Each structure stands twice: as C-alpha cells, then as structure tokens.
C-alpha cells in the first residue's frame, strides 16, 4: 500500500513530528479519508467524531498514484499540516484531531502494531500520546 516514515523535530521529547507516506498503489482521496475514519474508530475515537473528521479529510485529500507522497506534520501551535508531494494542501488545528489521525499508526491500539514498532524504533511515542516510557 505505502511505505511509511516517522520523523521527529529536535529531541525525542519534542512535541513536533511528521509522518510521510509514499504510496505503492493508486488510491482515491475519498478511499484514504474513509479508511482513516475507520481506523480512528478502531483506536477508540467515537463514531460520530470519526465520521466528521473523515468528511473533513475527504474535502482535501487528493487521489494518489504510485510514488506520490502524503506528509502530515504536527506542531502544537498549528495542529496538523498536510502536504501532497511537498505542496501544502490543508491545515487542521487542534490536538484532538492530530492525536486521532496520527494514532492510526502510533496509538498502541493501531491495527498495524508491527508498523508502529518500526516507525517508533526504540523511542517513545510523541508527547501528544501521553505514554510513559
């Protein structure tokens, strides 16, 4: 589906981080948004909230082709900023959305625990997840 990479800005305790997804297959923006909402529900986001966020994602997530990237960068002051192949496409404020979105990959209840381990390596998750290490 995609290759994922997780980046931290500064120290391991820094609240700023990024997730980059390089797609191996074609996907419509709506299928990415819908799957994101489903995965949010899986990690405990209430269905009504996940549906709202899925609809919001659907307004800006583009169709992707093999080799293209979607990058999401979190900063507490700005929320989550989305990029498609390096071009900014949206910015969503707020820590709650950010925690739910990045939780798809980084939450302990993710549907992809092996990928979570690969992304985080031996380090702790970002402070937004409030996990003690």
Please describe what each predicted stretch is.
Residues 1-133:
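Terminal leader/tail segments of proteins
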